[in-house]
Amino acid sequence: MPQASPTSAGHAAENQALEFLQGQGLRLLTRNWRCKGGELDLVMLDTDTVVFVEVRYRLHAGFGGALGSIDGRKQKRLVHAASLFLLKESCWANHPCRFDVVALQGSHHAGRPLQWLKNAFEC
């Protein structure tokens, strides 16, 4: 059986993360929000807090795995994209915000372990 492409594996990881977070009570505002220089995988609402969720999937743990792939450069891109989102979607500008990471590692099959890090980094 052929292995899933990185794109389809990434979409499957985002779908799994979305389903999990909705099960935790978060509400989807938008997904795959793109701007110059970045993309926000999931933008969700947790009560009144806008949550910018970065979904990271890695097949193997090499080079730090899924969590290790969120370096300072990636964090800056996410903060920049979130700032642009709040400028464009000004109805959310006065809400508290946070950055979460959902990390998945291993086979692309359903049921792979998922790690949810709330407030994964400060900006």
UniProtKB/Swiss-Prot annotation:
Short name of one Pfam family: UPF0102
Protein name: UPF0102 protein PputW619_0932
Entry-linked CDD domains: PoNe_Nuclease
GO molecular-function terms, A-Z: nucleic acid binding
PANTHER family: UPF0102 PROTEIN YRAN (PTHR34039:SF1)
HAMAP family for this protein: UPF0102 (MF_00048)
Family of this protein: Belongs to the UPF0102 family.
Organism of provenance: Pseudomonas putida (strain W619)
Gene3D superfamilies: 3.40.1350.10
SUPFAM superfamilies reported in the protein's UniProt record: Restriction endonuclease-like
InterPro entries associated with the record: Restrct_endonuc-II-like, tRNA_endonuc-like_dom_sf, UPF0102_YraN-like
